[in-house]
A protein has these predicted regions:
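Short, acidic, metal-binding catalytic loop of nucleotide-sugar glycosyltransferases
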Residues: 22-31
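N-proximal low-complexity "stem/linker" segments adjacent to membrane-targeting elements
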Residues: 1-23
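Membrane-interface aromatic/basic loop that binds lipid-linked glycans or pyrophosphate carriers
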Residues: 277-341
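Glycine-rich, basic loop-to-helix element that forms the pyrophosphate-binding segment
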Residues: 64-80
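Short aromatic/hydrophobic "clamp" motif used to bind/position activated sugar donors
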Residues: 85
Length: 341
């Protein structure tokens, strides 16, 4: 049995995918690597097929028409057979030593008959252009080195999140969650790091810097120019997240999970309002009104909580342009703090 299914969605990734895949191959026969060619127009598919020839027992290749990052993850999950499931973007990579420790930990848990539903590990923001890094860890938020439940997860502050880069889901639990990501949409990692969580009842935090998240390409979705341009896609993601669970469902979750799910929603709602208000147009104003209306019509209790008792409540009281200015300054500060900008 493969311990981890790594899914690597690729679109025109010829320049950097080899570093990513080579870092995963260090785990050997304990893993499978599913390379998803998402309609690339360069030699991504050729590179993927070469890897499959050279490592036939480890590499799988899916060739599909372009459907966006979410569709690549969906396709990979459909083919995955490993005990755990992990998405690795094609311009990112995993640390060999830390990955070996994770594999060893998984084996130990299997031997003891107590495999957790989700592994959490640190990730590293890498910005090679300025030779700088920033490690995102969870040492103050949860116990390390043992299996625990959500009741032991402490409150997260605003800038701290369990992003997709940190999470290794048990595959059967991920499937059970019914998570299917929208196609042709950026920022779907927000959904992926939110919707499956209630199905993950037992957790294990491995305090190792496993995932290296590359920052610096001009076409990246976190680039502020792209954020402003792609606000409608972030709004779609926010709709998916608010549709996933009602406020009543969230309230009934275990304390630590309930607190984190709410924190997650608050943060992504702030991001959504920022994406929208970072520029002005009549269309943007109407789109934001439509988003709030959608949330209100589906779940009035969740609407009231988000609109009037969340991180976004104060910015929503400000005039549009001032709101956009304040939130942009906040985003740029956060970027500087974690080396995004």
């Amino acid at each position: 049995m493969k311990l981890i299914s790594f899914v690597v969605p690729c679109y025109n990734s010829q320049a950097y995918m080899k570093k990513c895949i080579d870092s995963l191959l260090t785990a050997g026969e304990d893993v499978e690597i599913i390379i998803v060619n998402d309609g690339s127009t360069d030699i991504t598919l050729k590179i993927a097929k070469t890897y499959r020839v050279n490592f036939p027992s480890v590499i799988k290749v899916i060739d599909k028409p372009n459907g966006g990052h979410g569709s690549g993850i969906n396709a990979g999950l459909n083919e995955a057979e490993g005990l755990y499931f992990k998405v690795v973007d094609s311009d990112d990579w995993l640390d060999e030593t830390a990955l070996a420790k994770l594999i060893s930990t998984i084996k130990s848990h299997i031997s003891a008959g107590q495999s957790p539903d989700m592994y959490i590990a640190n990730f590293v923001y890498d910005k090679p252009s300025v030779n700088d890094t920033f490690v995102s860890h969870y040492r103050k938020k949860m116990p390390a080195g043992r299996i625990f439940t959500w009741d032991e997860v402490k409150k997260f502050r605003y800038s701290k999140m369990m992003l997709m880069h940190a999470l290794f889901y048990k595959r059967e639990k991920l499937v059970e969650s019914g998570t299917v990501l929208p196609e042709h949409t950026f920022y779907v990692d927000n959904i992926f790091a939110y919707k499956p969580l209630p199905c993950m009842q037992t957790l294990y935090y491995l305090d190792e810097d496993i995932y290296h998240y590359f920052i610096g390409r001009s076409d990246q979705s976190v680039n502020i120019k792209n954020i402003v341009k792609r606000y409608a896609q972030q709004q779609l993601v926010m709709r998916e997240m608010t549709d996933a669970y009602t406020w009543q469902q969230i309230k009934s979750m275990p304390k630590g999970l309930k607190r984190y799910m709410w924190h997650n929603l608050e943060v992504i709602m702030v991001n959504t309002v920022f994406f929208t208000c970072a520029d002005y147009s009549k269309e943007r104003v109407q789109d934001l009104k439509a988003l709030w209306k959608h949330i209100k019509e589906r779940d009035k209790a969740l609407y009231k909580k988000l609109r009037y008792f969340s991180y976004v409540s104060f910015p929503m009281m400000l005039p549009w342009k001032l709101r956009g200015w304040v939130m942009t300054k906040g985003y740029l500060y956060l970027c500087k703090k974690i080396k995004l900008g």
